[in-house]
Regions:
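ATP/NTP phosphate-donor binding region
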Residues: 1-91
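Solvent-exposed alpha-helices and their adjacent loops that cap or buttress functional pockets
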Residues: 4-5, 29, 84-87, 108, ...
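Short beta-strand/turn micro-motifs composed of small residues
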Residues: 37-38, 96, 153
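Alpha-helix capping and helix-loop boundary segments enriched in small/acidic/polar residues
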Residues: 68-72, 139-140, 161, 245
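A glycine/threonine-rich phosphate-anchoring loop and its flanking beta-alpha core
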Residues: 109-208
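Active-site segments that bind and position negatively charged phosphate/pyrophosphate groups
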Residues: 199-256
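Residues that form or flank phosphate/diphosphate-binding pockets in enzymes
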Residues: 45-46, 102, 161
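A short, small-residue-rich loop immediately preceding and capping a beta-strand
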Residues: 85-107, 111-120
Length: 256
């Protein structure tokens, strides 16, 4: 099941053949040694199977498994990951959710390596993103990096993720209604930078997510793939805008 995700100019495949397709992508780029970054849960969910796919393709890999939950994007975790980035490593592949992806994105960016994102849950719109939120000296700070060079996911793995993670992804998408309205108001009232094409795409994503919502009470693999595709499209809106403003507004604020 190959998904064509609109407005995303990189290879994106959500299918049961994701692992072998990733191996084919690496060979097409002349990459023979990969760093696989995961945590304990995501290693069991898909990291181990991906290692087997890489081995069958005669590709070398080193694996950094971040243990001792919760895994947060702190300086300690970043340093732990960097230790695995030896000179012979030619690309970085994150296998996991938002935090593992953020660390992997930062690692690849600073290490000047290609970055491949392998989501194990349809939980956030940051899989296709330029920002890496890190916790530096106890304060969350978003470091601007670059989007992944490719994205692969297995819908069976997405479906097996905790239901709360899919709910998080759906909530992220429905919240785009608020961020879309905020962005339009900002353009009208304060002359904020604005792109009507991206605005239309974001509104369409929010509407499609609401239509998808009833199916997620008892989702199929296709439903999980559709949810991830919408999250990727939302991320593409931010990449094309060069900032998170289109998809991040008052829906991200807390009232105390």
């Amino acid at each position: 099941m190959l998904r064509d995700v609109e407005h995303v100019p990189i290879p994106v495949e959500v299918s049961s053949d994701a692992g072998s397709s990733l191996a084919d992508f690496l060979r097409s780029r002349g990459i023979s040694r990969l760093l696989v970054l995961c945590d304990g849960n995501t290693y069991r969910a898909y990291g181990e199977a991906l290692e087997a796919d890489l081995e069958r393709a005669s590709l070398s890999r080193a694996t950094v498994r971040l243990e001792s939950p919760p895994v947060l994007a702190t300086e300690e975790r970043v340093v732990e990951s960097f230790i695995g980035l030896s000179p012979e490593i030619e690309a970085v592949c994150s296998v996991g959710g938002g935090t593992v992806t953020d660390i992997g994105r930062f690692l690849a960016h600073r290490g000047k390596r290609p970055f491949i994102s392998v989501p194990t849950a349809a939980s956030v719109d940051g899989f296709y993103s330029i920002g890496a939120p890190l916790i530096l000296k106890g304060v969350k700070r978003t470091v601007i990096c670059r989007p992944p060079d490719a994205l692969f996911a297995d819908p069976a793995v997405l479906l097996q993720a905790p239901r709360s993670l899919s709910a998080s992804g759906l909530g992220d998408l429905i919240g785009k209604i608020t961020s879309w309205a905020d962005w339009n108001l900002g353009a009208l009232l304060w002359d904020e930078p604005y792109d009507p094409g991206i605005s239309d795409r974001l509104r369409d994503i929010a509407i499609r997510s609401m239509k998808l919502a009833p199916r997620l009470s008892a989702p199929s693999q296709k439903d999980a793939a559709d949810l991830l595709s919408l999250l990727i499209e939302s991320g593409a809106c931010m990449v094309d805008a060069g900032e998170s403003r289109p998809a991040s507004g008052a829906d991200r604020k807390s009232v105390v």
